[in-house]
């Protein structure tokens, strides 16, 4: 700790709340007559697309749509895809009243279900899991007051000794943006699109004055029927670059971004198949800093009562992004049958756990992979879960910590599949995938700093003396000795050639 003569102050940046909520989104699809009738549903996928929030007092209203894609075999024997986007809306009571702009919401769709109600009618449902959080910013200052409640006069305040320390903290802000782009995709000249989807994969995120620049690719996934009657899948990278308004951002801020493909449409042009993509991007920027907190105080001439406050301060652990490769196999597969082949593959990654130890943050999860296999006029879906880990270096003092309790950490992570491959090898299917992961974590630490020193009556006069000696307890700090004796810390340090943080071994100290 450091002894600082000036008055400590600053903003105590903490976490106001970090909570979860869940609900369901459901809807029905009634397909037009030009769609083939449903003979067999092959798979259903869902993606949550948040688009609104409103905060009034402690009430939060948020909503959006869920984009469903249902792949099925029609009565014509071919694969078809139908989409729907039912809306969802929820109301949540917040633990505290905060400005609406400071509330962050992340929603994801899980466990999509599909039920056939009629040859051209489907019932859809997905579970929605939402994270709602907000940071707090509370002014902190140290003040001196008299016993009567007035501000202490300058002469009395000058007798105060303050023991302060610098505590790391971080300011976190988030912004959102909706953009669009287009580009050609890899497909045969006569290919007929069956299903398309996409994901956002930023590779460069930089902060500058009041803006965040995000560069990356939209990975377009296309399932198509070729002229020879076989199905092929392809992935194409469509580049994008966006400058997102970010009020308060500065050069050098640590930044990250992730996003969702809201819609992907395929059209045929003279250059081939072209993808038109709309996407949402969330960007976060962090600015590490410090706040000076007063741990203890006393007056060398007056009796002093201390007032303390509860404070929770967050500091940055990590903010990182990168790629991860995963692989696995399906041991017993329909792909082992004669003339069977892999039609398509898809994966939904999820990150379930984070651990912080040895100077590293380890985010663990799994990619739930679906492999579509054509055989004997049918298409079946086979599942495999591929575990993965993403590691990032911790910053600041956490770099040297052996471990950090999970209760002190808050984190978020997002993952997207940028490429996935499946290969038939005998009677099994080997699957590999590339993921893009964006993760950030912060540590919350509880303090009870001194916010007020109330100066009361003058200490009893110890009488005239040339030298005053104090016998400290072994292990007692020089600061504690000076406080107990009502001595000037600077004099104790100067006379004994020690520092306030030094621990005593029981030898006497001259305090005057």
Question: Where are these predicted regions, by residue range?
Answer:
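Membrane-lipid interaction segments
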Residues: 2-464
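Primarily a LysM-type cell-wall glycan-binding module
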Residues: 456-494, 499-511
């Amino acid at each position: 700790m450091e002894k600082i003569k000036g008055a400590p102050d600053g903003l105590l940046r903490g976490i106001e709340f970090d909570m979860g909520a869940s609900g369901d989104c459901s809807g029905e699809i009634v397909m037009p007559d030009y769609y083939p009738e449903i003979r067999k549903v092959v798979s259903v996928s869902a993606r949550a697309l948040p688009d609104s929030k409103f905060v009034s007092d402690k009430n939060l209203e948020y909503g959006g749509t869920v984009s469903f894609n249902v792949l099925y075999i029609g009565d014509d024997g071919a694969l078809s895809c139908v989409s729907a986007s039912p809306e969802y809306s929820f109301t949540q009571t917040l633990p505290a009243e905060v400005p609406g702009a400071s509330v962050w919401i992340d929603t994801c769709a899980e466990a999509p279900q599909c039920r056939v109600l009629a040859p051209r009618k489907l019932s859809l449902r997905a579970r929605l899991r939402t994270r709602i959080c907000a940071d707090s910013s509370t002014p902190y200052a140290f003040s001196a007051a008299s016993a009567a409640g007035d501000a202490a006069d300058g002469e009395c305040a000058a007798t105060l000794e303050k023991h302060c320390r610098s505590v790391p903290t971080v300011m976190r802000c988030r912004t959102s943006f909706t953009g669009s782009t287009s580009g050609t995709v890899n497909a045969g000249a006569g290919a007929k699109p069956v299903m398309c989807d996409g994901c956002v994969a930023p590779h460069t995120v930089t902060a500058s004055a009041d803006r965040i620049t995000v560069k990356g690719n939209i990975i377009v996934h296309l399932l198509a029927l070729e002229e020879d009657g076989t199905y092929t899948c392809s992935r194409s990278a469509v580049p994008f670059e966006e400058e997102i308004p970010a009020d308060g951002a500065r050069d050098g801020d640590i930044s990250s971004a992730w996003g969702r493909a809201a819609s992907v449409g395929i059209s045929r042009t003279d250059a081939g198949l072209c993808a038109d993509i709309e996407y949402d991007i969330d960007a976060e920027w962090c600015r590490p800093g410090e706040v000076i907190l007063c741990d203890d105080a006393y007056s060398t001439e007056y009796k002093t009562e201390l007032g303390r406050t509860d404070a929770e301060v967050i500091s940055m652990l990590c903010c990182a992004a990168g790629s991860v490769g995963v692989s696995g196999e399906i041991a017993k597969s329909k792909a082992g049958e004669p003339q069977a082949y892999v039609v398509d593959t898809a994966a939904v990654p999820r990150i379930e756990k984070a651990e912080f130890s040895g100077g590293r943050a380890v985010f663990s999860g799994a990619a739930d992979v679906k492999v579509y296999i054509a055989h004997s006029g049918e298409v079946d879906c086979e599942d495999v879960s591929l575990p993965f880990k993403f590691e990032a270096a911790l910053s600041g003092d956490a770099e040297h910590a052996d471990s950090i309790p999970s209760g002190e950490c808050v984190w978020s992570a997002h993952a997207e599949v940028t490429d996935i491959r499946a290969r038939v090898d005998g009677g099994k299917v080997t699957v590999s995938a590339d993921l893009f992961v964006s993760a950030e974590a912060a540590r919350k630490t509880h303090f009870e700093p001194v916010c007020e020193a109330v100066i009361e009556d003058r200490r009893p006069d110890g009488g005239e003396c040339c030298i005053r000696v104090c016998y400290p307890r072994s292990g007692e700090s020089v600061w504690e000795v000076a406080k107990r004796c009502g001595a000037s810390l600077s004099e104790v340090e100067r006379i004994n050639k020690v520092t306030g943080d030094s621990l005593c071994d029981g030898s006497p100290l001259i305090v005057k």
